[in-house]
Amino acid sequence: MAELVHLQNTSTAEDIIEVLNNDAGVIIDGLIDQKEVNLLNKDLAPYLKNDVFGRDEFTGFKTKRIGALIARSEACRNLALQPLVNEVSEKYLSPFCDGYQLHFTSAVSIGPGESKQILHRDRGIWGGYLPRRIEPLMSTIWAVTEFTKENGATQIVPGSHLWEKDRIPKENEIAFAEMKPGSVLLYTGTVLHGGGANSSKNDIRTGVFLHYALNWLRQEENQYLSCPPDIAKDIPQEVRSLIGYSKGGYILGFYSDPKDKNAVYESVSPENMFKDEVMDRFSTIPNPEELVQKSTK
């Protein structure tokens, strides 16, 4: 059976990326402590107690899923900023962008009797239109409970990011992301993976999914609806920027305030939405020649 590499929580971003380049998946053991895990459980429990089960085999008839974690959970906001994960995301994705964004948030609880999910690549969310050479995602699954093969630990196929798209993995090529609470699985958007079957009698497997994507791609979870301005104004600026209330490149993501009759907030960065003073406009191009040169890779 294939196995995933486990690294210590003292590992560097370079250590992690070296494994990702080979396997496209790696587990960092104990990256957050039990206190942080308890805070996640406390924040998520009121939502996961509801019957929010999947609607098909892919989402799982015995699997609960909730989103909008940035708006709903302070613990998840802190988790989204975890320094080592963000350093890895920035360095791994930097060949394809000038910044990254939070793409998707979800808490997933796989209940007893759930079947295994079909193996898939998360980059498929964009319909297969992205060139294969572009890696669009750095995804994470944080263990809130223990992940075991019996209770539905994520299936992942190490090295499958390098395969031809039609190759089907053999059973002995599939690894299981078995890990303790507070550990995290990092994996790319191109690796084959899927939720595992939960064959236990009463063991529920819960994880927090936080995925980071290139800042020029549309997010899977619409963060501006999941965390609208009236909620975003009360969360830390660093988190707001990560979910998209910021500019990308020179002008991506600008807005004009339709209620502003004096045209003060005209073609400005979303960051201005939460400031009393206009700090940034897109009306001046400091170096047009450089902008033109960078427009084609």
Residue ranges of model-derived segments:
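A structural signal for short, well-ordered beta-strand segments
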Residues: 104-107, 140-142, 208-212
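Short Ser/Thr-interspersed hydrophobic loop/turn segments at strand-loop and sheet-helix junctions
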Residues: 108, 146-147, 190-191
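Non-heme Fe(II)-dependent double-stranded beta-helix
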Residues: 2-22, 29-119, 123-129
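A structural signal for short, well-ordered beta-strand segments and their strand-loop junctions
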Residues: 27, 101-103, 155-156, 186-187
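Catalytic core of non-heme Fe(II) oxygenases with the double-stranded beta-helix
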Residues: 113-179, 206, 217-227
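Catalytic palm active-site di-aspartate
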Residues: 24-25, 182
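Conserved double-stranded beta-helix
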Residues: 167-186, 191, 196-297
